[in-house]
């Protein structure tokens, strides 16, 4: 069963707001990223709407300050298809927290991580608004995680005493427009960020001695160089493509895909027996 999801948009000059049904190919799609609030419904969260506050800017500043389509696609898939009850889940690049919130409401303990501390105040508010103040500390943890930082990765691992069960990420694999040459884009170029993300996923996957954590990653193709990340992943992970039939019907024809990764057994043995020096990743 699928549920529609909805968003708040301004409807007139007085800036009053109304709840407007969303479709991926509808006229309102581009407005969703600029809306102050978005509201989502999920089939397994009956009688509950998730409200997410956004602070995205039209100039592209603060990419984590809006809910991108991949976050909804991943959250919607996970709540229907993956049993997360009593699991310890790590979200990489959580942004405004939609995926983490949904999994928490499905009774997982979720460690929401991001490399941008400026997002944390709004992220905390989204958690409180949807999970409840009394449950936030019981069911979630917000952690700074800059990809490749050994100390921060160890802090995340230590939040799961019995080991990480699941790792999730949405819209973290992207390359900026290669025609735009500036410092910010260079810092986010594929040859810098993709190896860091790969090593982070590999490290976090190597420390559960009982089982290998499953990784679910939602991805929307933008530029061809993004394929280099998946080439890296194939070196150490078994890769499964989630069927498009299992994706929300609004996105079946979109370019959003969900991948499932599982660390290869021989890689897990190597990583757990050979420890690198601190912060060497």
Model-identified regions with their sequence ranges:
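S-adenosylmethionine-dependent methyltransferases
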Residues: 2-281
């Amino acid at each position: 069963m699928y549920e529609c999801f909805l968003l708040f948009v301004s409807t007139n000059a007085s800036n009053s707001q109304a709840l407007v049904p969303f479709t991926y190919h509808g006229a309102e799609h581009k407005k969703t990223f600029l809306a102050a609030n978005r509201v989502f419904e999920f089939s397994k969260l009956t009688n509950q709407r998730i409200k997410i506050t956004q602070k995205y800017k039209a100039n592209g500043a603060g990419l984590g300050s809006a809910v991108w389509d991949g976050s909804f696609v991943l959250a919607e898939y996970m709540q229907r298809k993956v049993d997360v009850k009593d699991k310890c889940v790590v979200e990489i690049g959580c942004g405004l927290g939609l995926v983490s919130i949904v999994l928490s409401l499905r009774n997982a303990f979720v460690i929401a991580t991001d490399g941008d501390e400026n997002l944390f105040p709004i992220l905390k508010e989204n958690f409180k608004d949807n999970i409840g103040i009394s449950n936030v500390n019981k069911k979630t943890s917000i952690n700074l995680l800059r990809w490749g930082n050994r100390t921060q990765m160890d802090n995340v691992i230590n939040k799961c005493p019995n080991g990480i069960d699941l790792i999730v990420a949405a819209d973290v694999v992207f390359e900026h427009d290669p025609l735009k040459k500036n410092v910010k884009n260079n810092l986010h170029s594929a040859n810098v960020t993709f190896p860091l993300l790969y090593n982070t996923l590999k490290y976090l996957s190597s420390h559960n001695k009982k089982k290998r954590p499953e990784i679910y990653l939602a991805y929307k193709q933008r530029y061809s160089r993004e394929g280099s990340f998946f080439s890296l992943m194939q070196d150490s992970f078994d890769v499964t493509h989630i069927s498009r039939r299992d994706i929300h019907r609004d996105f079946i024809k979109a370019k959003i895909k969900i991948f499932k990764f599982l660390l290869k057994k021989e890689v897990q043995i190597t990583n757990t027996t050979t420890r690198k020096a601190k912060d060497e990743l």
